[in-house]
Amino acid sequence: MTINLIAVGKLEKDFQKLFDEYAKRIFVFSKFNLIEIKENTLKNLEVKKEKETLEILSKIPKNSTVFLLSIKGKNYSSEEFSKLITNDANITFVIGGSNGVIESYFENKISFSKLTFPHQLFRVILIEQIYRAFTIKNNLKYHK
């Protein structure tokens, strides 16, 4: 199994430390790849969003089930999320840039909340939930 995360931008040092800790834990269950897309500096937000979206699409591995993280996506419980992501051989999660992505390119959308989260923090939340999903599937004590 391989989990891929494609995200626009780089993490700051403190968030990176937390992210790396969960990435290390995930390697027990699955390969994990992080693909960071450089944030585009164009002033025109629609052009910026389009360029970032096309860059993301070009990085998605073949035969991968893709989930865009979006406020418009479907909500899952931790148990449902575990079933969703641990039954596929190759999964890619996408976190767009600060101006979003062109969502029509993405069939599957997941929402963790109707709230808006800072991108730095959300990347850590996502990887923690991926780790939690594996602990649920493997009946480990982490999830209560």
From Swiss-Prot:
GO terms for molecular function: rRNA (pseudouridine-N3-)-methyltransferase activity. Keywords: Cytoplasm, Methyltransferase, rRNA processing, S-adenosyl-L-methionine, Transferase. It catalyses: pseudouridine(1915) in 23S rRNA + S-adenosyl-L-methionine = N(3)-methylpseudouridine(1915) in 23S rRNA + S-adenosyl-L-homocysteine + H(+). It is found in: Cytoplasm. SUPFAM superfamilies: alpha/beta knot. Gene3D superfamilies: 3.40.1280.10. Its main location: cytoplasm. GO terms for cellular component: cytoplasm. Coiled coil: none annotated. S-adenosyl-L-methionine binds at residues 68, 96, 112-117. InterPro entries: Alpha/beta_knot_MTases, RlmH-like, tRNA_m1G_MTases_N. Its EC number is 2.1.1.177. Homodimer. Belongs to the RNA methyltransferase RlmH family. Specifically methylates the pseudouridine at position 1915 (m3Psi1915) in 23S rRNA. This is Ribosomal RNA large subunit methyltransferase H. It comes from Mycoplasmopsis synoviae (strain 53).
